[in-house]
């Protein structure tokens, strides 16, 4: 029986993580979780899983939950999030929160020698050097939950990582993959939220449409697998059947395939190095699919992917700036305060405005994050 702490239980990854726990009650126990403002959902999860600690975002929601939570301790805010991440009984911490708020809980959980199931891209994007140093220092495993990084991780099982020639990350292309730049001037929030392959939260769905999501994954892959950016390629693959590939020195290429279902990589992170049945996910039927398609990525068409490569290669504090600018811009787009292509413009302005710090401390990263958010808000 593995004890799990889950950060971000009400989001897309969080709800699918609970599906996995539900499928294997003899293998996993939920000891703590966090939610934002979805209190009705939190009540249902408490009643089903009887965790010891639950964290909510707002202090005013604590009393509402305490009235129905029985023996479950209710905490709130950033301190509450840390309490969930550091639960003494938790062996695995699944970080499924969205945004840079996931950084500090990840670092503290690593210091507490918890195994980390990492679904929060922003943690490695903003502070990859700090996270990987901490993981090495405390001998902690970072197990990828993203389908692309899980695919690479599985392809590398038993392989000599020094023999890697390149990583090939696949991209569905998002909601607007078939639209021209001119057509993107007129797209709506509702258009952007209709992803062709995956069911995800609103922020990551917009990131998929701008291709920032893939850019974040490139930076994440750089840190997780220690591969230079020059050896990380992105290929457009509309079917989302091949989740990523690894090419080795001898030009052999290994790929991980499967139907688009996030529960597969989530469960693998929880069961690694073992595997368990996942019977209610669709079995891959290659003759039904028939043909798989691949296209070269156009970084002028998808400018956010170019920004991510530039930020990653520049290094230091630049990825944190790009990430903070993106979070503010995407939120403004979701609120219909800016157009779709303005997201790119705001990110570019923030990156051009920033003076890079080569090896920022945690405090400097948090300061830069806050300053960038203020700068972008002033531009809107």
Swiss-Prot record:
Pfam families in the cross-refs: DXP_redisom_C (PF08436), DXP_reductoisom (PF02670), DXPR_C (PF13288)
Keyword Metal-binding: yes
Catalyses which reaction(s): 2-C-methyl-D-erythritol 4-phosphate + NADP(+) = 1-deoxy-D-xylulose 5-phosphate + NADPH + H(+)
Keywords: Isoprene biosynthesis, Manganese, Metal-binding, NADP, Oxidoreductase
Domain of life: Bacteria
Example of a GO biological process term: isopentenyl diphosphate biosynthetic process, methylerythritol 4-phosphate pathway involved in terpenoid biosynthetic process
Positions bound to NADPH: 10-13, 36-38, 120, 122, 201
Cofactor(s) needed: Mg(2+); Mn(2+)
GO molecular function: 1-deoxy-D-xylulose-5-phosphate reductoisomerase activity; manganese ion binding; NADPH binding
Record InterPro entries: DXP_reductoisomerase, DXP_reductoisomerase_C, DXP_reductoisomerase_N, DXPR_C, DXPR_C_sf, NAD(P)-bd_dom_sf
Binding site for 1-deoxy-D-xylulose 5-phosphate: 121, 147-148, 172, 195, 208, 213-214, 217
Keyword Transport set for record: no
Binding residues for Mn(2+): 146, 148, 217
Pathway the protein contributes to: Isoprenoid biosynthesis; isopentenyl diphosphate biosynthesis via DXP pathway; isopentenyl diphosphate from 1-deoxy-D-xylulose 5-phosphate: step 1/6
EC number: 1.1.1.267
SUPFAM superfamilies for the chain: 1-deoxy-D-xylulose-5-phosphate reductoisomerase, C-terminal domain (SSF69055), Glyceraldehyde-3-phosphate dehydrogenase-like, C-terminal domain (SSF55347), NAD(P)-binding Rossmann-fold domains (SSF51735)
NCBIfam families xref list: Dxr (TIGR00243), PRK12464.1 (NF009114)
Family affiliation: Belongs to the DXR family.
Cited function: Catalyzes the NADPH-dependent rearrangement and reduction of 1-deoxy-D-xylulose-5-phosphate (DXP) to 2-C-methyl-D-erythritol 4-phosphate (MEP).
Name of the protein: 1-deoxy-D-xylulose 5-phosphate reductoisomerase
Organism: Bacillus cereus (strain 03BB102)
């Amino acid at each position: 029986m593995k004890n799990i702490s889950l950060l971000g239980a009400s989001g897309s990854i969080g709800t699918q993580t609970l599906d996995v726990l539900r499928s294997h009650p003899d293998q996993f126990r939920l000891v703590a979780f966090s939610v934002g403002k979805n209190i009705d959902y939190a009540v249902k999860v408490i009643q089903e899983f009887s965790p010891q600690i639950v964290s909510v975002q707002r202090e005013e929601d604590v009393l509402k939950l305490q009235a129905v939570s029985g023996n479950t301790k209710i905490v709130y805010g950033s301190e509450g999030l840390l309490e969930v991440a550091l639960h003494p009984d938790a062996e695995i911490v699944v970080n499924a929160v969205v945004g840079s708020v996931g950084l500090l809980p990840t670092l503290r959980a690593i210091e507490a020698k918890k195994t980390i199931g990492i679904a929060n891209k922003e943690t490695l994007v903003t502070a990859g050097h700090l996270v990987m140093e901490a993981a090495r220092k405390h001998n902690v495993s970072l197990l990828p939950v993203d389908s692309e990084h899980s695919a690479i991780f599985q392809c590398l099982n038993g392989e000599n990582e020094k023999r890697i020639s390149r990583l090939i990350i696949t991209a569905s292309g998002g909601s607007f993959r078939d639209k021209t730049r001119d057509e993107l001037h007129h797209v709506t929030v509702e258009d952007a939220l209709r992803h062709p392959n995956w069911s995800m939260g609103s922020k990551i769905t917009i990131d998929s449409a701008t291709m920032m999501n893939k850019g974040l994954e490139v930076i994440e892959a750089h840190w997780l697998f220690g591969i230079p950016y020059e050896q990380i390629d992105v290929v457009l693959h509309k079917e989302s059947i091949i989740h990523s590939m690894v090419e080795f020195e001898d030009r052999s290429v290994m790929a991980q395939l499967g139907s688009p279902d996030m529960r597969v990589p989530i469960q693998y992170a929880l069961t690694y190095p073992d595997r368990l049945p996942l019977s209610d996910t669709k079995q891959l039927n290659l003759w039904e699919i028939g043909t798989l398609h691949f296209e070269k990525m156009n970084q002028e068409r998808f400018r956010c992917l170019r920004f991510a490569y530039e930020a990653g290669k520049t290094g230091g504090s630049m990825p944190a700036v790009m990430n903070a600018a993106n979070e503010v811009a995407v939120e403004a787009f979701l609120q219909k305060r800016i157009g779709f292509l303005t997201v790119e413009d705001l990110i570019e302005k923030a990156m051009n405005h920033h003076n890079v710090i080569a090896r920022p401390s945690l405090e400097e990263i948090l300061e830069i994050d806050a300053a960038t958010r203020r700068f972008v808000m002033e531009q809107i």
